[in-house]
Amino acid sequence: MFHILSIVNIIWLLLALCFGAAFCLNKFSVKLPNRVEHVFQDFIRYGKTKENIKRASWQLVFDLSKRYFYHFYVVSVMWNGLLLLFSIRSVVMSEAFPDWIIDVLGSLTGRSRGAWNEIHLSTLLLQVLLWVHTLRRLLECLFVSVFSDGVINVVQYAFGLSYYIILGLTVLCTNDSLPQSESVSFFNQLTWYHVVGTLLFFWASFLQHQSLSLLAKMRTDSSGKVETLAHKMPCGGWFELVSCPHYLAELLIYAAMCVCCGCASLTWWMVVLYVLCNQALAAQLCHEYYRSKFKTYPHHRKAFIPFVL
């Protein structure tokens, strides 16, 4: 019971509930007092979805360029690369984690220091996949995506910076919920769900990259030179099914990582639930934007999940 109510699980559950509540409240926010609605909409929207909402002049002071998204991935590549290095040294050299990391993990999970004496193959695999994912996203932000003049607010920026720090620690927190295998050598822990999860991860990553590339191509010519920063109606690939296949791919990436730990970690299920709520909200706002901007927008196209949402 204490493990279920650990701080790390509560953090992700609360985040999921907050974004899930925001998703539901968005449909009825017009009934809120004007000042409350304006603040609410400002906090849940970013980029193009902020364009047509009413915002007080004081709110504009807290705007930052959406181009700063790459900062999140710089932090992640460095931080999660460091945690990955500690794990590799633990597996290869039987070197203990630094005391400060063990103390943080113990506070998040309520477990003793011994929970990280042995790093499970699933945990190390999750760390590798997370690092690969954020490295790819960093490279896409720098060399593929063409950002408009859209903005995010400073609270969203601060959340984005801290998100991957917490996520990296969360991956290590999953280690204590996985079955320990002292009698089985590290690489003999390899099983079918590691293979299936990794294959799903790379397929979802390809889907996300393809979708982001299609969005970028709508603003560039055949030589790759930027022609416009205007928002156009997306088409091609999975855009024929949903408005935001890159958000769907994000969910699939986290689901694939859940498969990699045999779907046995309650903590990672909480993360997947958060990603579902977060990406569903972002996708719904984009979907509403496209439908309001383009009169010929396909009626059959869903926001996030084909034929469902």
UniProtKB/Swiss-Prot annotation:
Descriptive protein name: Polyprenal reductase
Metabolic or biological pathway: Protein modification; protein glycosylation
Transmembrane segments: 4-24, 68-88, 115-135, 151-171, 186-206, 256-276
GO terms, biological process: dolichol biosynthetic process; dolichol metabolic process; dolichol-linked oligosaccharide biosynthetic process; polyprenol catabolic process
Top EC category: oxidoreductase
Membrane topology qualifier: Multi-pass membrane protein
PANTHER family reported for this sequence: DFG10 PROTEIN (PTHR14624), POLYPRENOL REDUCTASE (PTHR14624:SF0)
Organism this protein belongs to: Danio rerio (Zebrafish)
GO molecular function: 3-oxo-5-alpha-steroid 4-dehydrogenase (NADP+) activity; oxidoreductase activity, acting on the CH-CH group of donors, NAD or NADP as acceptor; polyprenal reductase activity; polyprenol reductase activity
Alphabetical UniProt keywords: Endoplasmic reticulum, Lipid metabolism, Membrane, NADP, Oxidoreductase, Transmembrane, Transmembrane helix
Cell location: Endoplasmic reticulum membrane
UniProt-listed PROSITE patterns: S5A_REDUCTASE
A Pfam family matched in the record: Steroid_dh
Lumenal side: 25-67, 136-150, 207-255
